[in-house]
Amino acid sequence: MVDLNDKVIRGYLRSLVGDDGLKMIEQMPEGNVTDEEIAAKTGVLLNTVRRTLFILYENKFAIVVRERDSNSGWLTYLWHLDFSDIEHQLMREKKRLLRNLKTRLEFEENHVFYVCPQGCVRLLFDEATETEFLCPMCGEDLVYYDNSRFVGVLKKRVEALSSA
């Protein structure tokens, strides 16, 4: 089983399935079990259990086995968790996040922004010229927005992720 005390793994799973889903993962019974059994043993609502299982299945962390009851013909779905690929998933997520941060950093560094003092909008220079430097929402004069602090924060995040 995966180390659920690891901050990174815990944070990643929480972002996928939320707090109730994480509670379900922590208390998940061993072996193949039905969603009803999981709900009964973990105390998590059945709808939440099902939603969590499908999210985990989409991310290749849950395996489902279908069995047909020979008497009734009904299908039973048996679930178990498999986090053997979580390190690979975390690396993919890190690369995706890093790529998005670099794209945003490049955008912020290469554009000039103007904002409404009332907080209505933030516009690119070209958009601001189209509105004659007036807020399209309230008509207030737009002012230059110095995004250097935000650029600095983005650079630190990119650097931290690149070195990790």
Swiss-Prot record:
Which terms does the UniProt entry file under GO BP?
regulation of DNA-templated transcription; transcription initiation at RNA polymerase II promoter
Report any Pfam family annotated for this entry: TFIIE_alpha
Every copy of the HTH TFE/IIEalpha-type domain together lies at 5-87
**DNA-binding is among the record's keywords:** yes
- The UniProt record lists the keyword DNA-binding: yes
Superkingdom, taxonomy of origin: Archaea
UniProt KW keywords:
DNA-binding, Transcription, Transcription regulation
MF terms (GO), sorted A to Z: DNA binding
Role noted for this protein? Transcription factor that plays a role in the activation of archaeal genes transcribed by RNA polymerase. Facilitates transcription initiation by enhancing TATA-box recognition by TATA-box-binding protein (Tbp), and transcription factor B (Tfb) and RNA polymerase recruitment. Not absolutely required for transcription in vitro, but particularly important in cases where Tbp or Tfb function is not optimal. It dynamically alters the nucleic acid-binding properties of RNA polymerases by stabilizing the initiation complex and destabilizing elongation complexes.
Q: How does it assemble?
A: Monomer. Interaction with RNA polymerase subunits RpoF and RpoE is necessary for Tfe stimulatory transcription activity. Able to interact with Tbp and RNA polymerase in the absence of DNA promoter. Interacts both with the preinitiation and elongation complexes.
Tell what the record comments on domains: The winged helix domain is involved in binding to DNA in the preinitiation complex.
Into which family does the record put it?
A: Belongs to the TFE family.
Protein name listed in UniProt: Transcription factor E
Organism, scientific name: Methanosarcina mazei (strain ATCC BAA-159 / DSM 3647 / Goe1 / Go1 / JCM 11833 / OCM 88) (Methanosarcina frisia)
Source organism lineage? Archaea, Methanobacteriati, Methanobacteriota, Stenosarchaea group, Methanomicrobia
Gene coding for it: tfe
